[in-house]
Design a protein with these regions (language model features):
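NAD(P)H-binding glycine-rich loop region in Rossmannoid oxidoreductase-like domains
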Residues: 48-50, 56-102, 110
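Active-site Tyr-X1-5-Lys
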Residues: 148-175
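NAD(P)-dependent short-chain dehydrogenase/reductase
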Residues: 170-176, 180-214
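Mid/C-terminal beta-alpha module of Rossmann-like enzyme folds, strongest
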Residues: 225-292, 309, 314, 322-341
């Protein structure tokens, strides 16, 4: 909820700062904020393709720079923190920790120093402990711990949440949202998932991986619920913004249905994919490309089958659309943007 004395109407007239504004979720969020008639300060580190041409105030800000964060957030009562280093086995730990830990710490401290009225912190489903694998994941599940088997992305997102909650105890009004794997339009970079769909469309996936799946959610549904979290979310609360679980094979088949892509018939068992992951990673490095899958990403695709977004549905009205609609709109956007050639 908004702090006492701050109405939704008055808040809608105030400046909103968005870190990671040019990313996949960020560019969709910025568009939705503008559609509400709000003033947006878009914080970006380098690339601006996701927000080029939009009527926003663009500010260059590396979130690993504490002073830059304070300057960039000054005068913005509402902050959405999306800047993150998403990595499932393709980046060394240092850069991931610098952004997801150091960057979040800097943003939180800047929010406290600048008197921000509400922070909406974007975490991830990965922030929650993967064990037990077959258990239902909801907001009551413990955060991932710093254990030898914990993936660096999971650990840093969990620790980022702890930093936000520590700031809440110090007086910061913040709410946390935890999306699952996001798919949808305005995927300029593209994202890892968007790149996988493009590669499948181009026929560069020799085989699909059996025994793998995840929870997939439309980026626009994530944004809509995050906007609701700003105005309706409880201070210090977490909200799982998830969609529908589908195996990777089922997702690829649905992608083929909406795009006309020829989907590989060969389905490799998980053990074979895991054995080949190091070779895929090495070949990708030689080509200067991000690997389509890694040992870590395959491990992720065996977890998180049972996820509940009941809390977000009840409190924020979260209502994920069918994946076929998401994939159809994603295909249409990729085609219009010239990313399928």
């Amino acid at each position: 909820m908004y702090p006492a004395g701050v109405s939704e109407q008055s808040n809608s007239e105030k400046l909103v700062a968005v870190t990671g504004a040019a990313g996949h979720i960020g560019s969709n969020l910025v568009r939705s904020l503008l559609a509400q008639g709000r003033r947006v300060r878009a914080l970006v580190r380098e690339h601006t393709a996701g927000i080029d041409g939009l009527p926003v105030e663009v500010v260059r800000c590396d979130v690993t720079d504490a002073q830059a964060c304070r300057r960039a957030l000054a005068g913005a009562p509402i902050v959405y923190h999306l800047a993150a280093r998403i990595s499932v086995g393709w980046d060394p730990p240092g850069p991931v920790e610098a952004v997801n830990l150091g960057g979040t710490r800097n943003v939180v401290e800047a929010c406290l120093a600048c008197g921000v009225q509400r922070l909406v912190h974007f975490s991830s489903i990965h922030a929650f402990s993967a064990d037990p694998v077959d258990g239902v994941i909801d907001e009551s599940r413990p955060l991932a711990q710093n254990q030898p088997h914990t993936l660096i992305y999971d650990r840093t997102k969990a620790e980022g949440e702890r930093q936000v909650m520590a700031a809440v105890a110090r007086g910061l009004d913040a709410v946390i949202v935890n999306p699952s794997s996001v798919i949808g339009p305005n995927d300029f970079a593209p994202s890892a998932m968007g790149e996988a769909l493009i590669e499948i469309y181009r026929g560069r996936f020799p085989a699909l991986v059996g025994g793998a799946g995840f929870d997939w959610v439309d980026v626009r549904d994530v944004v809509a619920s995050a906007l609701q979290a700003e105005t309706r979310g409880r201070k210090g609360a977490h909200y799982l913004l998830t969609g529908h679980w589908l195996s990777f094979v089922e997702l690829a088949q649905l992608w083929g249905k909406v795009s006309g892509a020829k989907i590989p018939r060969l389905v490799a068992p998980m053990w074979l994919a895991r054995a080949g992951a190091p070779f895929v990673a090495g070949w990708s490095r030689l080509r200067g490309k991000r690997p389509l899958f890694t040992s870590d990403s395959l491990r992720v695709l065996r977890n998180h089958r049972h996820i509940s977004h009941a809390c977000a549905s009840a409190e924020l009205g979260h209502n994920p659309r069918p994946l076929e609609e998401t994939l159809r709109h994603t295909y249409q956007w990729f085609k219009q943007a010239g990313k399928l050639t």
